[in-house]
């Protein structure tokens, strides 16, 4: 814990110094001076930040130059693993583990230049993406610890540290938010928390014996192709639902929020994306079905959790089938969700305002987003137990050696406010990913993808009247699909590191054709151990 505090102090000093950069040099804004050891680390970090664009350009040039090399692509060798090192020395059974530990760190820095917008935060509405140039960053460090509890049972603990600065206080974008690591309500002051504490029990039912390799959130083991799995505790529902080989983790692939899962999948979770609850999975060879019930936040997009799982909850069910087409692996899934939460319907908020103009965005004393538009309806006046439903489909398919395509689409009812994920009511995503075997860099990854998000007609009417939801609301709207293009190249180097350059082009930010387009340029450094 002393090490975490020491690192947190370094990050706090860096962020505090940046905030004070525009002030006279005689002020420190209350930021304490670093210790000699912290000062040395700061020098290294500053050198790294100043040289990162040059290094990235060199690596990318080397990667594409290697593509011209006609040498056969080698298979990727294993990166450094502490668990593998112990196994090599006879100190650990990595195939049937009693425990393991892994870690990761990721730093993501984004910049958007100024863009065109005829209005911003019109009439006191507050959820516009600011048209001025902005910088954003996230820094995370995570430790994954797993232990064998008894036969078939595993326990996991995952502490995490995060520091962040979003564009425009994380306002003005739907599913096109450029960095999934961003959390609602996060700050540049480093925060340490546990992201997961859960138990998993597996019951074998026969079939083929399969090997599960050691990794984060997975002990190395053997299990039956036909089995039952039960999970209980604190986790992300995306640890089990809508997982896939291509784009599940923004730390390795696409950075955009809409590529993590269905943009319209308003899965119940706190502001960090985690929940409490249970999941049950049934595997039968190439088929799987899973169900889960998890906790929502007490208020939309906030951190405190409502543990009344029989009153407010998020339910989901997913059916999965794995297949091969011409010996190329693929997968299809269908997912449905049903949430019961204390949330407002757009039509009820509009009706309340039209019946009494005093029930506007500035007068409600319950939970609200702080809009200053006295001429607009507000969801605060409409919150009561309501249900949100949606259904989606997903498919992924290898179409060649280390080349794959994927797509997903979801339709949600669009009658109630966003409670945890994005403002999308309908969403669709397609993408193409390639590993670098063809140009002799087998651990490099390149990808291009497109993401679309729509809102319902009643949602658009509410925003057009000046209302805001958890993420969007310019004060007026020319309703249109929010579109984003994401292009990235991730270069692997020195065994455990990846350096990524990413470009995103966002059209109709906040579902508003009157504003934008927006360009976002991002550099990411990621290490895993």
Predicted features by range, described:
Residues 58, 64-133, 144, 148-150, ...:
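N-terminal periplasmic/intermembrane-space "pro-region" immediately following the signal or transit peptide
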Residues 71-72, 195-208, 517-529:
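Outer-membrane beta-barrel "beta-signal"
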Residues 89-101, 112-114, 146-155, 204-227, ...:
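Short loop/turn motifs that connect adjacent beta-strands in outer-membrane beta-barrel proteins
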Residues 97, 135-141, 190-195, 272-276, ...:
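Residues that define the transmembrane beta-barrel architecture of outer-membrane proteins
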Residues 103, 141-147, 197-201, 232, ...:
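Residues on the lipid-exposed face of transmembrane beta-strands in outer-membrane beta-barrel proteins
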Residues 318-320, 335-385, 406-408, 413, ...:
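Outer membrane beta-barrel transmembrane domains
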């Amino acid at each position: 814990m002393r090490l975490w505090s020491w690192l947190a102090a370094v990050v706090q000093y860096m962020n505090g110094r940046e905030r004070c950069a525009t002030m006279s040099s005689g002020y420190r804004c209350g930021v304490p001076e670093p210790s000699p050891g912290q000062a040395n680390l700061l020098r290294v970090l500053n050198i790294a930040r100043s040289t990162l664009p040059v290094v990235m350009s060199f690596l990318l040039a080397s990667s594409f130059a290697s593509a011209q090399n006609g040498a056969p692509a080698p298979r990727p060798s294993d990166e450094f693993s502490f668990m593998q090192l112990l196994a090599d020395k006879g100190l650990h059974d990595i195939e049937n583990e009693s425990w393991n530990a892994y870690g990761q760190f990721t730093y993501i820095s984004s910049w958007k230049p100024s863009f065109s917008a005829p209005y911003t935060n019109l009439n006191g509405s507050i959820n516009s993406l600011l048209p001025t140039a902005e910088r954003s960053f996230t820094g995370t460090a995570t430790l994954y610890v797993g232990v064998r509890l008894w036969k078939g049972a595993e326990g996991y603990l995952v502490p995490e540290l995060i520091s962040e600065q979003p564009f425009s206080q994380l306002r003005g974008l739907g599913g096109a938010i450029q960095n999934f690591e961003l959390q609602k309500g996060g700050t540049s002051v480093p925060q340490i928390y546990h992201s997961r504490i859960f138990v998993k029990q597996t019951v074998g039912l026969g079939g083929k014996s399969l090997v599960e390799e050691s990794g984060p959130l997975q002990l190395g083991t053997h299990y039956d192709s036909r089995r039952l799995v039960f999970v209980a505790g604190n986790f992300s529902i995306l640890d089990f639902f809508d997982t896939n080989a291509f784009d599940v983790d923004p730390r390795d692939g696409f950075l955009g929020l809409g590529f993590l899962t269905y943009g319209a999948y308003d899965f119940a979770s706190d502001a960090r994306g985690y929940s409490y609850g249970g999941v049950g999975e049934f595997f039968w060879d190439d088929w799987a079905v899973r169900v889960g019930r998890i906790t929502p936040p007490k208020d939309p997009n906030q951190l405190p959790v409502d543990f009344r799982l029989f009153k407010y909850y998020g339910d989901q069910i997913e059916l999965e089938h794995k297949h091969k087409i011409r010996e190329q692996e693929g997968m299809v899934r269908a997912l449905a969700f049903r949430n019961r939460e204390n949330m407002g319907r757009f039509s009820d908020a509009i009706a309340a305002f039209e019946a009494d103009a005093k029930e506007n965005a500035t007068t409600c004393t319950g939970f609200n987003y702080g809009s200053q538009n006295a001429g607009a309806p507000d969801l605060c006046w409409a919150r009561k137990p309501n249900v949100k439903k949606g259904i989606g489909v997903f498919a992924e398919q290898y179409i060649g050696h280390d080349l794959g395509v994927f797509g997903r689409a979801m339709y949600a009812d669009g009658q109630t406010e966003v409670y945890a994920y994005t403002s999308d009511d309908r969403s669709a995503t397609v993408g193409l990913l390639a590993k670098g075997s063809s140009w002799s860099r087998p651990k490099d990854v390149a990808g291009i993808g497109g993401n679309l998000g729509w809102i319902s007609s009643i949602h658009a009417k509410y925003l057009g009247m000046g209302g805001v939801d958890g993420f969007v609301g310019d004060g007026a709207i020319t309703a249109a699909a929010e579109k984003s293009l994401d292009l990235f190249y991730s270069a692997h180097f020195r065994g455990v590191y990846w350096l990524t350059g990413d470009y995103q082009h966002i059209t109709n930010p906040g579902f508003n054709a009157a504003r934008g387009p927006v360009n976002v340029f991002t550099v990411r450094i990621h290490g895993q151990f």
